Amino acid sequence: RDHAVAKIDINDNIAVNRATFGGWKIDACPHHGPAITRGGDWGYHMAWFDGGEKAGLFYGRIDGDAWVSSPAKRFGNANFQAGHPSLLSINEKVYLAWKEINESDNYIVLAISEDGGKNWLEAKKIKKTEGASDYPELIQFNNKAFLSWNTIKDGYQFIALE
């Protein structure tokens, strides 16, 4: 269940490159698609779940042909079912949000890079709710970052991240 990146040029030529190498084998749909966002003037930021031998969430930067950040960076707490990442890049600032769950609560965790994904500030739990909730989505509006999140208890939330 590895991922690939496809580039299509103006003549509709397609170049497909393998993007992850976890080797996870599953005979089902795990409902964990990757998150991808353009990385400034070049390349892409990508976050994904791998359920193989080293299960968890991973982040990397790819230029479309090869990994720029290697090895991929692990993030999230697997003990709290970290999953469903969302990515947003605004200039050199990269936002990475994901969901974690414990016995009764759901959390949204946010990590920020200010240098195009090379280094990351410490991840912080920024929202909490009891009961069921949707997955986080990061949205850009007027060059600012927002979190979109829907919960059973607290309803829909649209939160400025700065």
Positions of PLM-derived features:
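Extracellular, repeat-based ectodomains that mediate carbohydrate processing or recognition
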Residues: R1-E162
